[in-house]
Amino acid sequence: MGKKIAVVLTYYFEDSEYTEPAKAFKEAGHELTVIEKEKGKTVKGKQGTAEVTVDASIDDVNSSDFDALLIPGGFSPDQLRADDRFVQFTKAFMTDKKPVFAICHGPQLLINAKALDGRKATGYTSIRVDMENAGADVVDKEVVVCQDQLVTSRTPDDIPAFNRESLALLEK
Protein backbone atom coordinates (compact mmCIF):
# COMPACT_ATOMS: atom_id res chain seq x y z
CA MET A 1 0.00 0.00 0.00
CA GLY A 2 1.31 3.43 -0.94
CA LYS A 3 2.39 5.99 1.60
CA LYS A 4 1.23 9.59 1.88
CA ILE A 5 4.13 11.96 1.40
CA ALA A 6 3.97 15.64 2.27
CA VAL A 7 6.08 17.93 0.09
CA VAL A 8 6.87 21.41 1.38
CA LEU A 9 7.57 23.68 -1.53
CA THR A 10 7.53 27.30 -2.61
CA TYR A 11 8.97 29.47 -5.35
CA TYR A 12 12.41 28.81 -6.77
CA PHE A 13 12.74 25.22 -5.65
CA GLU A 14 15.38 23.24 -7.54
CA ASP A 15 13.26 21.79 -10.34
CA SER A 16 14.76 18.31 -10.59
CA GLU A 17 14.93 17.90 -6.81
CA TYR A 18 11.15 17.95 -6.84
CA THR A 19 10.29 16.42 -10.21
CA GLU A 20 12.59 13.40 -10.07
CA PRO A 21 11.75 12.22 -6.53
CA ALA A 22 8.05 12.98 -7.16
CA LYS A 23 8.12 10.82 -10.29
CA ALA A 24 9.89 7.98 -8.47
CA PHE A 25 7.51 8.11 -5.50
CA LYS A 26 4.42 8.17 -7.73
CA GLU A 27 5.72 5.30 -9.87
CA ALA A 28 6.18 3.29 -6.66
CA GLY A 29 2.53 3.91 -5.76
CA HIS A 30 2.93 6.67 -3.21
CA GLU A 31 0.72 9.76 -3.00
CA LEU A 32 2.22 13.25 -2.82
CA THR A 33 0.62 16.39 -1.40
CA VAL A 34 2.36 19.66 -2.21
CA ILE A 35 2.06 22.10 0.69
CA GLU A 36 2.68 25.83 0.62
CA LYS A 37 1.10 28.90 2.19
CA GLU A 38 -1.74 29.05 -0.33
CA LYS A 39 -3.66 26.14 -1.82
CA GLY A 40 -4.24 26.26 -5.58
CA LYS A 41 -1.46 28.61 -6.55
CA THR A 42 1.31 27.60 -8.91
CA VAL A 43 4.93 27.74 -7.80
CA LYS A 44 7.79 27.71 -10.26
CA GLY A 45 11.19 26.12 -10.02
CA LYS A 46 14.32 28.24 -10.24
CA GLN A 47 15.40 26.61 -13.51
CA GLY A 48 12.06 27.42 -15.12
CA THR A 49 11.36 23.84 -16.18
CA ALA A 50 8.86 22.91 -13.46
CA GLU A 51 5.61 24.43 -12.31
CA VAL A 52 3.70 22.81 -9.48
CA THR A 53 0.16 23.48 -8.30
CA VAL A 54 -0.13 23.57 -4.53
CA ASP A 55 -2.47 20.89 -3.18
CA ALA A 56 -2.88 22.19 0.36
CA SER A 57 -2.21 25.17 2.58
CA ILE A 58 0.08 24.66 5.56
CA ASP A 59 -2.86 25.87 7.67
CA ASP A 60 -5.00 22.93 6.53
CA VAL A 61 -2.61 20.03 7.14
CA ASN A 62 -1.16 18.17 10.07
CA SER A 63 1.91 15.95 10.10
CA SER A 64 -0.28 13.14 11.42
CA ASP A 65 -2.00 13.07 8.00
CA PHE A 66 1.23 11.87 6.35
CA ASP A 67 3.71 9.03 6.46
CA ALA A 68 6.78 10.94 5.24
CA LEU A 69 8.11 14.37 4.28
CA LEU A 70 10.03 15.49 1.17
CA ILE A 71 11.99 18.76 1.28
CA PRO A 72 13.40 19.64 -2.16
CA GLY A 73 16.25 22.12 -2.33
CA GLY A 74 16.82 25.33 -4.21
CA PHE A 75 15.73 28.59 -2.61
CA SER A 76 12.46 27.10 -1.35
CA PRO A 77 13.68 25.74 2.04
CA ASP A 78 15.32 29.04 2.94
CA GLN A 79 12.05 30.86 2.33
CA LEU A 80 9.96 28.27 4.15
CA ARG A 81 12.15 28.22 7.25
CA ALA A 82 11.26 31.86 7.86
CA ASP A 83 7.70 30.70 8.54
CA ASP A 84 7.32 28.90 11.86
CA ARG A 85 4.37 26.87 10.57
CA PHE A 86 6.70 25.03 8.18
CA VAL A 87 9.40 24.70 10.82
CA GLN A 88 6.97 23.11 13.29
CA PHE A 89 5.49 20.88 10.58
CA THR A 90 8.99 19.63 9.73
CA LYS A 91 9.93 19.19 13.38
CA ALA A 92 6.85 17.03 13.97
CA PHE A 93 8.02 14.48 11.39
CA MET A 94 11.40 14.22 13.07
CA THR A 95 9.91 14.03 16.56
CA ASP A 96 7.47 11.33 15.45
CA LYS A 97 10.31 9.42 13.76
CA LYS A 98 8.65 9.51 10.35
CA PRO A 99 10.84 9.40 7.24
CA VAL A 100 12.18 12.77 6.09
CA PHE A 101 13.88 13.20 2.71
CA ALA A 102 15.90 16.42 2.32
CA ILE A 103 18.13 17.19 -0.64
CA CYS A 104 20.58 20.02 -1.32
CA HIS A 105 19.30 23.05 0.66
CA GLY A 106 16.44 20.99 2.13
CA PRO A 107 18.24 20.54 5.48
CA GLN A 108 17.82 24.28 6.10
CA LEU A 109 14.32 23.51 7.38
CA LEU A 110 15.79 20.83 9.65
CA ILE A 111 18.29 23.36 11.00
CA ASN A 112 15.51 25.73 12.02
CA ALA A 113 13.51 22.82 13.42
CA LYS A 114 16.52 22.02 15.62
CA ALA A 115 16.28 18.45 14.33
CA LEU A 116 19.86 17.74 13.25
CA ASP A 117 21.62 17.51 16.60
CA GLY A 118 23.41 14.17 16.79
CA ARG A 119 22.34 13.16 13.28
CA LYS A 120 24.60 12.13 10.43
CA ALA A 121 23.61 14.07 7.31
CA THR A 122 24.77 15.83 4.18
CA GLY A 123 23.64 18.84 2.19
CA TYR A 124 24.76 21.43 -0.29
CA THR A 125 28.28 22.75 0.29
CA SER A 126 27.18 26.23 1.38
CA ILE A 127 24.95 24.97 4.21
CA ARG A 128 27.25 22.32 5.69
CA VAL A 129 28.76 24.67 8.29
CA ASP A 130 25.24 25.66 9.33
CA MET A 131 24.37 21.98 9.63
CA GLU A 132 27.46 21.37 11.78
CA ASN A 133 26.55 24.35 13.96
CA ALA A 134 23.12 22.75 14.39
CA GLY A 135 24.83 19.64 15.77
CA ALA A 136 24.90 17.42 12.69
CA ASP A 137 27.76 15.08 11.86
CA VAL A 138 28.12 16.27 8.27
CA VAL A 139 29.68 13.99 5.68
CA ASP A 140 30.38 14.57 2.00
CA LYS A 141 28.59 11.61 0.43
CA GLU A 142 25.96 11.35 -2.30
CA VAL A 143 23.40 10.06 0.16
CA VAL A 144 23.28 9.61 3.92
CA VAL A 145 20.66 7.55 5.74
CA CYS A 146 20.50 8.24 9.47
CA GLN A 147 18.67 6.10 12.02
CA ASP A 148 16.31 4.66 9.39
CA GLN A 149 14.53 8.01 9.30
CA LEU A 150 16.47 10.81 7.65
CA VAL A 151 17.72 10.65 4.05
CA THR A 152 19.87 13.55 2.85
CA SER A 153 21.77 14.28 -0.36
CA ARG A 154 23.94 17.10 -1.69
CA THR A 155 22.92 18.09 -5.24
CA PRO A 156 20.81 17.10 -8.25
CA ASP A 157 23.65 14.78 -9.28
CA ASP A 158 22.79 12.67 -6.23
CA ILE A 159 19.11 12.20 -7.11
CA PRO A 160 19.42 8.54 -8.23
CA ALA A 161 20.97 7.56 -4.87
CA PHE A 162 18.56 9.84 -2.99
CA ASN A 163 15.56 8.23 -4.69
CA ARG A 164 16.91 4.71 -4.16
CA GLU A 165 17.43 5.18 -0.42
CA SER A 166 14.20 7.14 0.07
CA LEU A 167 12.16 4.43 -1.64
CA ALA A 168 13.94 1.72 0.36
CA LEU A 169 13.06 3.51 3.59
CA LEU A 170 9.41 3.78 2.55
CA GLU A 171 9.31 0.02 2.08
CA LYS A 172 10.30 -0.67 5.71
UniProtKB/Swiss-Prot annotation:
Active-site residues per Swiss-Prot or TrEMBL entry: C104, H105
InterPro entries with a match to the protein in the record: C56_PfpI-like (IPR006286), Class_I_gatase-like (IPR029062), DJ-1/PfpI (IPR002818)
Alphabetical list of SUPFAM superfamilies matching this protein: Class I glutamine amidotransferase-like
GO terms (BP aspect): proteolysis
Null mutant phenotype: When combined with a yraA disruption shows significantly reduced growth in the presence of formaldehye and methylglyoxal.
Residues in PfpI endopeptidase domain copies: 3-171
Its EC number(s): 3.2.-.-
GO molecular function: peptidase activity
UniProt induction comment: By heat shock, salt stress, oxidative stress, glucose limitation and oxygen limitation.
Keyword Ligase among record annotations: no
Keywords: Hydrolase, Protease, Stress response
Domain of life where this protein originates: Bacteria
Pfam entry (one): DJ-1_PfpI
Record keyword Protease present: yes
Family per record: Belongs to the peptidase C56 family.
UniProt cross-references to PANTHER family, sorted A to Z: DJ-1 PROTEIN, DJ-1_THIJ_PFPI FAMILY PROTEIN
Function description: Functions in the protection against aldehyde-stress, possibly by degrading damaged proteins.
Family annotation (NCBIfam families): PfpI
Name this polypeptide is given: General stress protein 18
Source lineage: Bacteria, Bacillati, Bacillota, Bacilli, Bacillales
